[in-house]
């Protein structure tokens, strides 16, 4: 098969071609057991392929391949590693449309508004990190005229990366691109809901990278992710997902005394001050809530605090704009909003909507379910804007990970800051105001790892990204994160006498 998508091979055909396979040591290979599990299109529930059912034996094979490749990859000059990773990014850019269609097929994210964006960011991330190969610098430390004291940055070894289903390609890139440039080899465990797009990414990259440098497994957490975390040859774990799973991984890594990076949940606040530009703030709420992704984002602006003077107008404008968004087949170019990813998540989101009503909230359901009969069984959920929810309600306190946001009133700036910070999460926050002093003060006082003013959604590979509180440990993206997460420091003292 050509490395390009054959014109008459649609994304369904590509999923079938990748079915039943991991990628280990540069080649597609079935699970040791031969077992597979079914993956369905969330919009119609039609089967799209069978993913390899990864277990401990598959983990052993993938890690062994990474160990074999480790020394040669680490010995490759850093600048050359960077060139190879950047070349991967350019090749992935040539494959953007097929990757976008494949990730839309398995996740239900709208092709036009979400999946193509993810495929573009994927390529950009590898190109960006590829340029950092020359930045793996240590330091010279003044100590004694007769001694040369330096620090070196060395790779950790084999990195285990466990990725989520909501933006699988992008979040995988933010983990493995810096790991590879830093000289590590990688074993990725994909989410069971979205195994094919990232497998295709790995297949494409293995045309450039040496065998064993980048390996990928599909499977479920206990059978595949667990053995990966506890494997004795894994020297670092990076994970994006739920808080509870993150705690489990943290405990397992602690037994081995290896470093972890955890990007976990969020319940991100958005503050709209009385002097804010109302139209811009409403538009920011739509992008911030990731309604086009059915709200399936850890940074979703799911708590919106609006000054009492703007509250009613804000809610009406937000309802009208979300109501105008088109929900439909993710592959349709007219579609703004696709589906929830799975039945489990679909039921979870709907249970929270029911709970919000019971907790006293007024639910404003927006947009309209698709009328196409073939989509009748799909995991479509109308976006819901809650008003009047108590601050201690579960719908305000807990991460829903769906198209559900709560709009609440405040009267003073101090009240808004207090409500925004009253959460066990601390991933992202935004404030909308025309007052520079208010904006600057808020950036200092908001308890979040990523704060934006008068905008939302901007996440770039050269900006550190990560949360505080229960939103995780460590940062991703940026040069600093690459050095902190994927290198270990060695001190060298040379006595020259």
Where are these regions (language model features)?
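Conserved C-terminal structural/oligomerization subdomain of aldehyde/semialdehyde dehydrogenase
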Residues: 46-49, 234, 271, 326, ...
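ALDH superfamily catalytic-core signature
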Residues: 208, 244-390, 453, 496
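Rossmann-like NAD(P) dinucleotide-binding subdomain of oxidoreductase/dehydrogenase enzymes
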Residues: 138-280, 410
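Glycine-rich loop-to-alpha-helix module at the N-terminal edge of alpha/beta enzyme cores
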Residues: 46-136
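Hydrophobic face of amphipathic alpha-helices that form TPR/SEL1-like repeat modules
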Residues: 1-43, 368
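Short, well-ordered beta-strand elements within core beta-sheets of diverse protein domains
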Residues: 47-54, 68-75, 161, 270-273, ...
């Amino acid at each position: 098969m050509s490395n390009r998508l054959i014109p008459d091979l649609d994304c369904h055909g590509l999923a079938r071609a990748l079915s039943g396979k991991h990628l280990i040591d540069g080649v597609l290979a079935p699970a040791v057991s031969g077992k597979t599990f079914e993956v369905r299109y969330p919009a119609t529930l039609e089967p799209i392929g069978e993913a390899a059912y990864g277990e401990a034996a598959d983990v052993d094979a993938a890690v062994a391949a990474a160990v074999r490749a480790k020394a040669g990859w680490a010995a490759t000059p850093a600048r050359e590693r960077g060139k190879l990773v950047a070349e991967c990014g350019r090749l992935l850019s040539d494959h953007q449309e097929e990757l976008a269609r494949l990730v839309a097929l398995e996740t239900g994210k709208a092709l036009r508004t979400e999946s193509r964006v993810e495929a573009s960011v994927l390529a950009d991330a590898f190109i960006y990190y590829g340029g950092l190969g020359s930045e793996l610098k240590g330091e010279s430390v003044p100590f004694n005229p007769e001694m040369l004291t330096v620090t070196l940055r060395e790779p950790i070894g084999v990195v285990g990366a466990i990725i989520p289903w909501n933006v699988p390609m992008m979040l995988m890139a933010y983990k493995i691109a810096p790991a590879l440039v830093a000289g590590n080899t990688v074993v990725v465990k994909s989410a069971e809901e979205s195994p094919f797009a990232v497998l295709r990414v790995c297949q494409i990259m293995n045309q450039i990278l040496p065998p064993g440098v980048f390996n990928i497994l599909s499977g479920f957490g206990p059978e595949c992710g667990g053995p990966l975390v506890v494997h004795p040859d894994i020297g670092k774990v990076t994970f994006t997902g739920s808080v509870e799973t993150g705690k489990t991984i943290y405990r397992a890594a602690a037994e081995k005394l290896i470093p972890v990076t955890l990007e976990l949940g969020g319940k991100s606040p958005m503050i709209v001050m009385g002097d804010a530009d109302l139209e811009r703030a409403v538009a920011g709420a739509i992008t911030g809530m990731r309604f086009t992704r059915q709200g399936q984002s850890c940074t979703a602006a799911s708590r919106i605090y609006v000054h009492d003077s703007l509250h009613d107008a804000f809610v009406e404008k937000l309802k009208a704009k979300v109501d105008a968004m088109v929900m439909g087949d993710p592959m349709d170019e007219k579609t703004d909003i696709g589906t929830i990813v799975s039945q489990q998540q679909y039921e979870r989101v709907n249970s929270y909507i029911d709970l919000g009503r019971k907790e006293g909230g007024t639910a404003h359901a927006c947009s309209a379910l698709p009328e196409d009969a073939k989509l009748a069984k799909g995991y479509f959920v109308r976006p819901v804007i809650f008003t009047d929810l108590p601050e201690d309600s579960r719908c305000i306190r807990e991460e829903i990970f769906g198209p559900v946001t709560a709009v609440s009133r405040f009267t003073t700036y101090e009240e808004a800051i207090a409500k925004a910070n009253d959460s066990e999460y601390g991933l992202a926050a935004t404030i909308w105001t025309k007052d520079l002093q208010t904006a600057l003060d808020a950036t200092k006082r908001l308890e979040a790892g990523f704060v934006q003013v008068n905008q939302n959604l901007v996440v770039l590979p050269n900006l550190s990204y990560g949360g505080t509180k229960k939103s995780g440990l460590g940062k991703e993206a940026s040069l600093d994160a690459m050095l902190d997460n994927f290198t270990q420091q060695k001190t060298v003292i040379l006595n020259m006498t």
